[in-house]
Amino acid sequence: MLQTALDYLDTDLQIKARKALDAMRADPALKAMGVDGIAVSETMRHLSTQMAYYSRGRMPVPDVKAMYAAAGLWKISDKEAVKSITWTLESKHLLGKAIDLVPLRRGSTWWIAPDSVWSRMGEIGEQHGLSWGGRWKKRDTPHFEM
């Protein structure tokens, strides 16, 4: 089960994340790019969820699907199951020190937003004291942490 409430986060991150979210939601540049909101896609993460994410691209598809089911996650497609999405079992999400944010367009999550949208979100997050995963060698554009 995915946690999306900011209350699950470390207190310092809650404060910074709220300010960053408010700034992103009010940002005229993001609005001009077609963003009509920002959603929290994940905050605190259970170890079973992290293990399911980590299994993608590393285990046979049926095993990945079983891991997702055991963690209470959505039914993952074969295409998703073979694509790696995390490179660690020690995510800061496990400690409540990370948050994933996604832009909304026409009220729906916009995972395939252009780089300019993710970059602007990253800049705003950094202005509020967050480290942005879009700067990493293996980019994680929705990810912000302390």
Q: What are the residue ranges of the model-derived segments?
A:
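Active-site acidic/histidine clusters and adjacent loop/turn architecture
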Residues: 1-42
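Short regulatory "switch" loops immediately downstream of catalytic or recognition motifs
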Residues: 23-28, 55-63, 104-106
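Short aromatic/hydrophobic-glycine micro-motifs
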Residues: 29, 35, 58, 129-132
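Acidic helix-start/capping segments at beta-turn-to-alpha-helix junctions
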Residues: 36-55
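Glycine-rich, histidine-containing beta strand-loop boundary motifs that form or position
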Residues: 42, 72, 136
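Mixed-charge, low-complexity intrinsically disordered segments
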Residues: 51-91
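Catalytic cores and adjacent binding grooves of peptidoglycan-active enzymes
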Residues: 75-146
